[in-house]
Amino acid sequence: MFNILKQVSDYAKGSIQAAKYIGEGLSVTFDHMRRRPITVQYPYEKLIPSERYRGRIHFEFDKCIACEVCVRVCPINLPVVDWTFNKEIKKKELKHYSIDFGVCIFCGNCVEYCPTNCLSMTEEYELASYDRHELNYDNVALGRLPYKVTQDPMVTPLRELGYLPKGVIEPHDLPAGSQRAGKRPEEITD
């Protein structure tokens, strides 16, 4: 008889212990159900990157002294720096700077070791494209145009297409009364 009572008491203890474990498991489940979802609907909602996020590199043309430190510290020798030596002022003049983000590993060495701080990491992470050649960013795509943009051969033809509001002085280096390539809105007739 004592054997049966012992079995019943063991069964009751086991049932209570099983209910306790099930209750603990359900409490964890309900805690997770009450939390906000971590998943975001990416194209419509975007998470804000952290302060030190290493995204696309921003380049400032005017600060660069063409020292090529960025090329030497890059593990894959990625930045392409084209420069000429100006004998009059005895300094290097930067002609072209480009980085191929299809190859870049975003280590940040170029930004860290740049002596003039002309390189900086942005929070931009959307670099996807259908053509890998679109990921090769030149000095204009990496940042802003140089101060002497009126002497840039790539920008000069585009400047002639610009329209100036009434009363504004003519653009630099254009003769007065020169024809624009396009028509003003009031010159267009249906």
Curated annotation (Swiss-Prot):
PROSITE patterns membership: 4FE4S_FER_1 (PS00198), 4FE4S_FER_2 (PS51379)
Gene3D superfamilies in UniProt: 3.30.70.3270
InterPro entries referenced in this protein's UniProt entry, alphabetically: 4Fe4S_Fe-S-bd, 4Fe4S_Fe_S_CS, NADH_quinone_OxRdtase_chainI, NDHI
GO CC annotation terms, alphabetical: plasma membrane-derived thylakoid membrane
Domain 4Fe-4S ferredoxin-type: 55-84, 95-124
E.C. code: 7.1.1.-
Subcellular location: Cellular thylakoid membrane
Annotated residues for binding of [4Fe-4S] cluster 1: C64, C67, C70, C114
Cofactor notes: Binds 2 [4Fe-4S] clusters per subunit.
EC top class, as a word: translocase
GO MF terms, alphabetically ordered: 4 iron, 4 sulfur cluster binding; iron ion binding; NADH dehydrogenase (ubiquinone) activity; quinone binding
Keywords tagged on the record: 4Fe-4S, Iron, Iron-sulfur, Membrane, Metal-binding, NAD, NADP, Plastoquinone, Quinone, Repeat, Thylakoid, Translocase
Chain spans, region Disordered: 169-190
Membrane topology category: Peripheral membrane protein
UniProt-annotated binding residues for [4Fe-4S] cluster 2: C74, C104, C107, C110
Cofactors that this protein relies on: [4Fe-4S] cluster
GO biological process, one term: photosynthesis, light reaction
Family: Belongs to the complex I 23 kDa subunit family.
Subunit and partners: NDH-1 is composed of at least 11 different subunits.
Protein name, as recorded: NAD(P)H-quinone oxidoreductase subunit I
Organism, as annotated: Microcystis aeruginosa (strain NIES-843 / IAM M-2473)
